[in-house]
Amino acid sequence: MKIIFMGTPEFAVPALTKLINSNHKVVAAFTQPPKAKGRGLSETKSPIHQLADEAQIPVYTPTTLRNEEAANLINNIDADIIVVIAYGFIIPQNILDAKKYGCLNIHPSDLPRHRGAAPLQRTIIEGDKTSSVCIMQMDAGLDTGDILMKEDFDLPKKITLQELHDKCANLGAELLIKTLANIDKIVPKPQSNEGVTYTHKLTKEEGRVNWQDSAFSINCKVRGMNPWPGVYFKYNDKTIKILEAEYSDEEHNFTPGTIINKNLEIACGKGILMIKKLQQEGKKVLNIEEFLRGFKTPVINKVQ
């Protein structure tokens, strides 16, 4: 099968790698234009751009697909299907319909739960116990297309965002190959109208701890928002970012936000948050033992 691949970040790399090493032929790769990075502001190609270059796949970097030029470009590429994974641009209907098998997408959540821009982060932030990877036939809606293949899995209690990212990227790549091999036999399954949720992009403001929340909820945020935007609190007008934590459901009578002992354990609306790794603004990352050597605070103090 001849494939146009559309993707940009590391999440899309396992799928393109699988396709390159399969009996299919990737005839073109579309990705976000190179971006200026670093002190010298040199242009850096996306991970998909770099991989496609290595595999000698023609690469296209339009700034939009919503014009006649992009439509003509895609129409003139001889392909059977378009695979879209974290591309970063909306795909207009004329391109969704441009090829025989339309456009397929890998979505890392249990659709229709966590449609939208941040499914991986929200899966962890919401404390989900299970998740899925779906191969979806794209339509004009936001992650509303029929499901062609799906695999469910349990989530370890301490799973990090990077671990979930890697698992879904690799599992999605495997499911994509299986889907392409059986595409003429698969009966598309419409998504349920129940249990629909949408995820928006994270903001820096969401990372600030609300100590009225449960310790469980705050710990989920720590795992789901690392590295960005990061979960943080204020102490003596300084920002401290929590990079790793554990929690206890132990009952207490402290006001939420109270530092209850010299190990920097903090009372929450329910339970206690035990910080294990953190970073003070302008300082390097420290584990809790290293941090406490230079951190003097009386017990029964408040953070914000």
Swiss-Prot record:
Matching Pfam families: Formyl_trans_C (PF02911), Formyl_trans_N (PF00551)
Residues that, per the record, bind (6S)-5,6,7,8-tetrahydrofolate: 109-112
Reaction(s) catalysed by this chain's protein: L-methionyl-tRNA(fMet) + (6R)-10-formyltetrahydrofolate = N-formyl-L-methionyl-tRNA(fMet) + (6S)-5,6,7,8-tetrahydrofolate + H(+)
Molecular function GO labels: methionyl-tRNA formyltransferase activity
UniProt-listed InterPro entries: Fmt (IPR005794), Formyl_trans_C (IPR005793), Formyl_transf_N (IPR002376), Formyl_transf_N_sf (IPR036477), Formyl_transferase-like_C_sf (IPR011034), Met-tRNA-FMT_C (IPR044135), Met-tRNA-FMT_N (IPR041711)
Enzyme kind, highest EC tier: transferase
EC identifiers of the protein: 2.1.2.9
Key words of the record: Protein biosynthesis, Transferase
Protein function: Attaches a formyl group to the free amino group of methionyl-tRNA(fMet). The formyl group appears to play a dual role in the initiator identity of N-formylmethionyl-tRNA by promoting its recognition by IF2 and preventing the misappropriation of this tRNA by the elongation apparatus.
Record family assignment: Belongs to the Fmt family.
NCBIfam families: fmt
Protein name: Methionyl-tRNA formyltransferase
Origin species: Rickettsia bellii (strain RML369-C)
The organism's taxonomic lineage, starting at the top: Bacteria, Pseudomonadati, Pseudomonadota, Alphaproteobacteria, Rickettsiales
